[in-house]
Design a protein with these regions (language model features):
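Hydrophobic h-region of N-terminal signal peptides that target proteins for export
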Residues: 2-11
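N-terminal amphipathic/hydrophobic interface segments
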Residues: 10-167
């Protein structure tokens, strides 16, 4: 009987939520060039759990529960965290969002900007590794690498860390 309960618990842990396509102006396929990929263009919107993701165009890998989003990428999670970038690689099974180029992450008045940001939605950790800046109403901090936990308001920085404060 104990083995049955252990296996049920394991099965529950392995259960993944699916990424859903909410909207796209056009949907096409190119089985020769991009097998098993949905090619989406125009006001594309995806939903994954509590997050919405918007973009101009995307490749949706439904079998892999992942997507590549391009142009005016915007992620909204709950009512207090938003992210923007030119490109987003999103992996639904791990809830990992990889933003690239012109990236901004906004949470409760703090803005993180960089060109390379990975946001682990499952662990609520955003990290950058090619230089970044975090600003709030009074401070500006720059560093080469950083790790930011938005909902705990905790951050760790390394590599040429510089803090600018009015006092």
């Amino acid at each position: 009987v104990l083995l049955f309960f252990c296996l049920c618990g394991y099965a529950e842990q392995k259960k993944q939520s699916l990424v859903y396509l909410e909207h796209s102006e056009t949907l096409s396929f190119d089985e020769k060039r991009l097998p098993d990929v949905q090619i989406l263009v125009g006001n594309v919107c995806f939903r994954h759990d509590s997050a919405l993701m918007y973009c101009d165009s995307a490749y949706f890998f439904e079998k892999d529960n992942s997507l590549h989003a391009f142009g005016h990428v915007h992620l909204i999670q709950g009512d207090s965290l938003e992210g923007w970038g030119d490109v987003l690689y999103y992996y639904g099974d791990t809830k990992l969002a990889k933003f690239r180029r012109n990236v901004r992450l906004l949470h409760d008045g703090a803005t993180l900007t960089t060109d390379y940001l990975n946001y682990d939605r499952a662990k609520d950790i955003a990290y950058y590794f090619e230089g970044g800046m975090i600003e709030d109403s009074i401070n500006t901090l720059t560093s080469l690498r950083g790790q930011y936990t938005p909902y705990n308001d905790q951050a760790v920085f390394s590599g040429e860390v510089r803090l600018v404060h009015p006092n």
